Swiss-Prot record:
Belongs to the acetylglutamate kinase family. ArgB subfamily. This is Acetylglutamate kinase. The lineage of its organism: Bacteria, Bacillati, Actinomycetota, Actinomycetes, Micrococcales. It is found in: Cytoplasm. It comes from the Bacteria. Keywords: Amino-acid biosynthesis, Arginine biosynthesis, ATP-binding, Cytoplasm, Kinase, Nucleotide-binding, Transferase. The keyword Cytoplasm applies. One of its GO terms (molecular function) is acetylglutamate kinase activity. Pathway: Amino-acid biosynthesis; L-arginine biosynthesis; N(2)-acetyl-L-ornithine from L-glutamate: step 2/4. One of its GO terms (cellular component) is cytoplasm. The gene is argB. Transmembrane segments: none annotated. The record marks K41, K268 as: Transition state stabilizer. InterPro entries: AceGlu_kinase-like_sf, AcgluKinase_fam, ArgB, Asp/Glu/Uridylate_kinase, Glu/AcGlu_kinase, NAGK-C.
Length: 316
């Protein structure tokens, strides 16, 4: 009888050892975060690049399988813009900011809940029956009040745009308790502002910022982490100096920096600050253009992006 000998290339064995080393490096982080809740705000280039979309779904499924409870909160600006253009609906701007008219709000609602959310649920569920889509309207999950903005010292009405002032996490917890992954679109019923987020609804639905919505959800769930995917490497002390990337800062340090930040980073960093102030242990800005960036941040010693931590942790 003739036996065929099979040999392994030295390089393949080296690659295998590297992979084993990566798994061992991840072990203490898997042990630390198993059983905890992580809220991830999904947005930016990760939403429109097919490879990044698939990688994001893989990351969420990986988190689920190592015992973490991921909750995904998403916007959908590029998809909304595309649909408005296809339908011939002209966008109105005031002070450089989009005004959400009733006609535009119908599109926002349709795209976020009926397109972006469904596509993301489908990507995750290509790996198994894990994800369940939700809207901020479902079960009174989110409550919002209408907000405008100030441009050149004057109040500007942005239409059906709101800020989340209340979260009822019961529906999310039910899905998590069932072993599923909630995927939440950021539209919310409007309520009359009574100062504590529990006023009566008006019957109107508002478009809310996904960063601040994710922070509110993280706070309501008592999440261990809030992760916001964006299109930059993190927070820079002196933008655009790439060497000034900040790896970690305290809530007080961020509070001092906030008024001086670039306008595009303000809502994201304000969301991180809100989450930390309301008891979330860590808030992170992570580059969503990098495949598997969430896993690199969570399960490697070096981490990536910028993390915000409570003052007490540094002073302890």
């Amino acid at each position: 009888m003739t036996m065929t000998a099979h040999t392994r290339e030295t390089t393949s064995m080296s690659d295998a050892q590297d992979k084993a080393g990566t798994l061992i490096e991840a072990l203490p982080w898997i042990q630390r975060f198993a059983g905890t809740t992580m809220v991830i705000k999904y947005g930016g280039n990760a939403m429109v690049n097919d490879d990044l979309r698939r990688a994001f779904a893989e990351d969420i499924v990986f988190l689920h399988h190592v015992g973490i409870h991921p909750v995904v909160v998403h916007g959908g600006g590029p998809q909304i813009n595309s649909m408005l253009s296809r339908l011939g609906i002209e966008s109105e701007f005031k002070g450089g900011l989009r005004v959400t008219t009733p006609e535009a709000m119908d599109v926002v609602r349709m795209v976020l809940t009926g397109q972006v959310g469904r596509e993301l649920v489908g990507l995750i569920n290509s790996h198994g029956p894990y994800a369940v889509g939700m809207s901020g309207e479902d079960g009174g999950l989110l409550r919002a009040v209408r907000t405008g903005t100030v441009v050149d010292g004057e109040e500007v009405d942005l239409g059906l745009v709101g800020e989340v002032v209340g979260v009822d996490p019961a529906g999310i917890k039910d899905i998590l308790d069932a072993g599923r992954i909630p995927v939440i679109s950021t539209v919310a019923p409007e309520i009359l502002d009574d100062g504590n987020g529990s006023g009566p609804t008006t019957g109107q639905v508002l478009n809310v910022n996904a960063d601040t919505a994710a922070a509110a959800v993280a706070s309501a769930l008592g999440a261990t982490k809030l992760v916001i995917l964006t299109d930059v490497e993190g927070l820079y002390a002196n933008w655009p100096d790439k060497s000034s990337l900040i790896s970690s800062l305290t809530a007080s340090e961020l509070r001092d920096m906030l008024p001086r930040l670039e306008s595009g980073m303000i809502p994201k960093m304000a969301a991180c600050l809100k989450a930390i102030d309301e008891g979330v242990e860590r808030a992170h800005i992570v580059d969503g253009r990098l495949p598997h960036s969430m896993l690199l941040e969570t399960f490697t010693t070096a981490g990536i992006g910028t993390q915000v931590v409570p003052d007490e942790e540094v002073n302890a």
